[in-house]
Design a protein with these regions (language model features):
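A short beta-strand element within the Helicase C-terminal
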Residues: 47-50, 224-226, 233-248, 257, ...
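Conserved SF2 helicase motif VI
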Residues: 83-84, 250-274, 292-293
Length: 304
């Protein structure tokens, strides 16, 4: 557990609540907020802590999450978020966590480090199916489905990932659809020795398998494939250095979460690289790509 990296503490004093476990110590406990609420009632244990640290505190606008924060009687409260934004409910964050005390300038942070931040755009030849071209604003779920099923586009991604693995990089393939995740995972499973597939709803046995793959020796090739929703928050693997953004997004906050998976310090890491697949032939996707470019610049990335 990473807490042991920063605290001089007996591991037996670190408790866990959530993920099927309930072993609190009352000293330092790590809990899933969802595990602290049952049938609308907040677990009494919440009131016993003196210091509350809320990761991804932008979720406090959700009713059940705010209930947990309100039930706490902690003297000290710390909220952490990479994606706080004014959404009409943002005042709840400040009510529960207090004012913003510190901001990290992503561009300055990137410039200070010894790790280069690079983006490599890969322009695809993707075109919308005829059935979607008649709509003034084609529905995005249908667009994503068409992207996921485009063989030429998937071939491009597949070749790029294999080349990265050949160059001894540690790649993360990110998609927004479970059917695309399954397709990509099946294809790579025949070519890469260690493949970890991450998505919501994994069984305990599947999670153990993923953990064993993630722990593979650095001398062995390894590929992580995940849905953005799963990896957007809380995932930590310092070995990752290459991101394949296979589905278009536009909001800078989401982009910051995704590329942030690469920013952990790790021995021998000299650069991080994002492969961005730009579908320039589709106006709405081209506009999303333009927003990502602005987002990359704000995050201290350079376009190759």
């Amino acid at each position: 557990m990473r807490l042991r990296t920063f605290l001089d503490i007996d591991p037996k004093l670190i408790g866990v609540i959530g993920g099927g476990k309930r072993k609190p110590t009352g000293v330092v406990d790590v809990a899933l907020i969802q595990s602290l609420v049952r049938n609308g009632e907040v677990d009494d244990i919440v009131a016993g802590y003196g210091h509350l640290v809320i990761d991804e505190c932008h979720h406090l606008s959700a009713v059940s999450f705010e209930r947990v924060a309100r039930r706490a009687k902690a003297r000290y409260v710390l909220g952490l978020s990479a994606t706080a934004r004014k959404d009409g409910h943002h005042a709840i964050i400040f009510m529960q966590c207090g004012p913003v005390r510190h901001k990290v300038d992503a561009r300055a942070h990137a410039a200070e480090g010894m790790i280069r931040h690079l983006v490599r755009e890969r322009t695809t030849k993707f075109e919308l199916p005829a059935v979607l071209t008649t709509a003034e604003r084609p529905p995005m779920p249908a667009v994503y489905a068409a992207l996921a099923g485009d063989d030429a586009r998937n071939d491009l991604i597949f070749d790029d990932v294999l080349h990265a693995i050949e160059r001894k990089r540690s790649p993360l393939v990110l998609t927004e659809r479970k059917d695309h995740l399954a397709l990509v995972a099946d294809r790579f499973s025949r070519f890469v020795k260690n493949v970890a597939v991450l998505s919501g709803g994994l069984s305990a046995a599947e999670r153990k398998l993923v953990e064993s793959v993630l722990a593979a020796p650095e001398s062995e090739e390894r590929l992580v494939i995940a849905t953005g929703r799963y990896l957007g928050e809380g995932f930590d693997d310092s070995r990752l250095d290459t991101l394949f953004l296979t589905m278009p997004i536009s909001w800078k906050g989401t982009l910051a979460q995704y590329v942030g998976r690469l920013h952990r310090q790790h021995a021998g890491k000299t650069d991080v690289l994002v492969y961005d697949y730009v579908d320039a032939g589709v106006p709405v996707l081209a506009r999303m790509a333009a927003k990502r470019r602005a987002g990359y610049r704000a995050l201290g990335y350079s376009l190759e």
